[in-house]
Curated annotation (Swiss-Prot):
GO terms for molecular function: structural constituent of ribosome. The lineage of its organism: Bacteria, Pseudomonadati, Pseudomonadota, Gammaproteobacteria, Legionellales. It comes from the Bacteria. Keywords: Ribonucleoprotein, Ribosomal protein. Coiled coil: none annotated. GO terms for biological process: translation. Pfam families: Ribosomal_L27. Residues 1-22 are annotated as: Disordered. This is Large ribosomal subunit protein bL27. PANTHER family: LARGE RIBOSOMAL SUBUNIT PROTEIN BL27M, RIBOSOMAL PROTEIN L27. HAMAP family: Ribosomal_bL27 (MF_00539).
Length: 90
């Protein structure tokens, strides 16, 4: 009878699913209300004007407009805001 000894167990062999983090809309791009701008862990980017932040720190637009990235404050923190589109009047 052919016999094969038992192989040792391994401690590798698992991997987590990708989380698709990062900037989704860049500076100057037009966005609609509700569009996701940044998906992140923690607050690398902070919400500025016309921006909302979800409980997982996702930043999203509250109004239609253009995305603007700025650094401000004494610690030069990154803020993302939405500039409203200017209405052209005839």
């Amino acid at each position: 009878m052919a016999h094969k000894k038992a192989g040792g167990s391994t401690r590798n062999g698992r991997d987590s699913n990708p989380k698709m983090l990062g900037v989704k809309r860049f500076g100057g791009e037009r966005v609609l209300a509700g569009n996701i701008i940044v998906r992140q862990r923690g607050t690398h980017y902070r919400p500025g004007e016309n921006m909302g932040m979800g409980r997982d720190h996702t930043l999203y637009a509250l109004i239609e407009g253009k995305v603007k990235f700025i650094r401000k404050g004494p610690k030069k923190r990154n803020f993302v805001s939405i500039e409203p589109l200017e209405e052209s009047q005839p």
